[in-house]
Amino acid sequence: MSDARKLSAMDASFLYLETPEMPMHVGSMAIFRLPDDYKGDFFEEFKAMIASRLHIAPILKARLEKAPLDIDHPSWVEDDQFDIDRHIFRGSLPAPHDRATLERIVGWMHAKLLNRARPLWEFYVFEGMKDREIEIGRAHV
């Protein structure tokens, strides 16, 4: 992403309407059943896979920048301080390691606003469900 790209009125409206009580990002959740003989580190492999594909979607390395005097919609600009470790996190699902616990965590996560000083996306990889890894994503893109 070489030049600033101004948000459309529609995209900017999601930012303007967002409040701490009403986040406007979208979310996803995927539960992966790992093969019985899997010996790898799912988190590290997932992070490496995302990192290897960032060039396909440069917007994932862009942050918001307000217009001078805030007289226009914000723009996406390349984040020179981009660090994938600020966007992909590892967690452990607390006991009792069940679907209800997972749903409570997802609800808590989606209630938090994304940090507008950084590119507006995050992934969390949770371990703790029997032979499964859970990926939870949030994004404003």
Where are these regions (language model features)?
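Non-catalytic N-terminal regions of enzymes
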Residues: 1-139
